[in-house]
């Protein structure tokens, strides 16, 4: 049965750019001959300069009991080895990755008509990497990580704030808050990286990098 907003939703449409329309160059395989990382970092920088909120936000998809689950997280590192993010290892995503250490992430920069999709095996990072990042987090974020038993049910927001107050008091005299034993980073090692650029008439540009192979894909 059609909902009251179906007609409105079906009519939503954004027209993408083109060389002729706005001078934006077409994504080309030549841009990727030195690997995926240079263009990826450039697109992150472009998104930041364009005022995109949280240009390092990515949609992380994991598998739970054979069923996909997705959520938004923040990328906190990118190099030739892969993409790094941090979380509670006892969270739902941590449980998923313990059972199936493979994931995909998508960086959607809607304002620019671009996205990058990356997928590959996942492993926990070296504990020192987690320590280094943890030491740079704001104190409030550190307290929040200690307070939250991530993904577990709780009776109310008041109860959650009570937990935050408890850890705030516990660490009140501590200049440095220690890294929780169940908190740290994951590394996604790129097996496949796909760059997508929206183009006029939905004839989009898609280029996939798999190892040393660079392929243009039909939209």
Curated annotation (Swiss-Prot):
Reactions accelerated catalytically: pyridoxamine 5'-phosphate + O2 + H2O = pyridoxal 5'-phosphate + H2O2 + NH4(+); pyridoxine 5'-phosphate + O2 = pyridoxal 5'-phosphate + H2O2
Cofactor notes: Binds 1 FMN per subunit.
Disulfide cysteine pairs (residue numbers): none
Binding site for substrate: 13-16, 76, 133, 137, 141, 202-204
GO MF entries: FMN binding; pyridoxamine phosphate oxidase activity
Binding, FMN: 71-76, 86-87, 93, 115, 150-151, 196, 206
The entry's keywords: Flavoprotein, FMN, Oxidoreductase, Pyridoxine biosynthesis
Biochemical pathway: Cofactor metabolism; pyridoxal 5'-phosphate salvage; pyridoxal 5'-phosphate from pyridoxamine 5'-phosphate: step 1/1; Cofactor metabolism; pyridoxal 5'-phosphate salvage; pyridoxal 5'-phosphate from pyridoxine 5'-phosphate: step 1/1
Summary of subunit composition and partner proteins: Homodimer.
Function in brief: Catalyzes the oxidation of either pyridoxine 5'-phosphate (PNP) or pyridoxamine 5'-phosphate (PMP) into pyridoxal 5'-phosphate (PLP).
Source organism (scientific name): Mycobacterium leprae (strain TN)
Gene from which the chain derives: pdxH
EC number: 1.4.3.5
Keyword ATP-binding among UniProt keywords: no
GO BP of this protein: pyridoxine biosynthetic process
Any Pfam family hit: PNPOx_N
PROSITE patterns recorded: PYRIDOX_OXIDASE (PS01064)
Family according to the record: Belongs to the pyridoxamine 5'-phosphate oxidase family.
Name of protein: Pyridoxine/pyridoxamine 5'-phosphate oxidase
InterPro entries cross-referenced by the UniProt entry: Pyridox_Oxase (IPR000659), Pyridox_Oxase_CS (IPR019740), Pyridox_Oxase_N (IPR011576), Pyridoxamine_oxidase_dimer_C (IPR019576), Split_barrel_FMN-bd (IPR012349)
